[in-house]
Amino acid sequence: MKKNFLFVMAAAAMLASCSKDAAVSEPAGTGNENGVVDPTDPNSPVLVRLGAGGLGVDVTPTRGVVDSWNNTVVGIYALAKDADFTEWQAGDGSILLENEKGTITGNPDGSVIKDAITIAEKYYPGNNDIHYTFYGYYPYAGADADDTTPPTNENGKVTKTFTINGSQDIMWGQAVATKINNKDGGEQLDGYNALYFRKGQDAATPDIAFEHKLTQLNFKIKKAGEFSTAGPDKQLSVTKIEINTFPSLDLTIADKAGTDNGNIVPTDAIGGAADIPVIKNDAGDDADAVIVDNIDGESAFGTSMMVYTAGETQTTYSAKVYLKMGTDGEEVSSPITIKLAEDAAFEAGKSYNVNIAVNSMMKVEVNATLTKWQPGDDAEDIEIN
């Protein structure tokens, strides 16, 4: 089952006398659940409302991994789907929300309350001839974010380039309006606008289902069955693990043609893959060494690493495990190949435990087990000599 993260967005509108440019602020009344300020007024403005569906998994606020909403900051777009617009430009009504910052509050226990997303108060334009689709992405990038470079909007595509160190949990989602009947008759309503919520039969607040775009790897170290200590001054340590993956990725947030929505690919201009060290925090500091002799059971190495997957063709990851005996010993790298049973592919939105069993300086056993985000089968054991 794919785990999605939902937040609810009510369409927005302005009074009919207002212009058809991007949404603006306007005082609101009590309104109904879809944001219509005065349901008895056929020309009532419709407020943009943001909320979130319920999730039951806790998340540590300091980590990049998102399992539930907890003051999570996302970027939101509302863009015209109409064929009249070949691209989205300021001033022509095709952009309702552009990289709008939204905060999904959540609850202390990790569950989510409705209307938990906070943005500046916005309304739809008063005319009803433009139909919008909503898009969201995480982590948010803008002038007031850690990443100050916002997404680009060029040639009918909104894209964001992420430079990653393994801590970034990149997510994306969209909400496309379902065709519904007009209470007054005539053509069905197709696309979020003021009329959709004023006159739509059974109009529902838009849901954006965020999905993880990367694969999560969790490294664990343990003693192999044949492990024996060489003495207190020759304790064996795993000092570093490197994954061969892509350090820069391009996420398509919105594509006017509709073919690339949500796609994530390596950045062409950066080049190929690189060896990225397993880290211990969002700052990108290398994970602390683990002394194998002292392990009782297993020991986590670093923190969760989010890495790119090519989908069906990503059946392996190459990595290096660095070993050192004693404080003055030579550091030796041991290449490993991480793979799943039956050559299954590593999937976005899934979490895998990579269990490394150390026998000696030149013998490492590896297996990977799928956990957390989505459950799945265990991976086959691999022994590297």
Where do the PLM segments sit?
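Extended, compositionally biased non-globular segments
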Residues: 288-344
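Extracellular/surface-associated beta-sandwich interaction domains
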Residues: 2, 26, 34, 207, ...
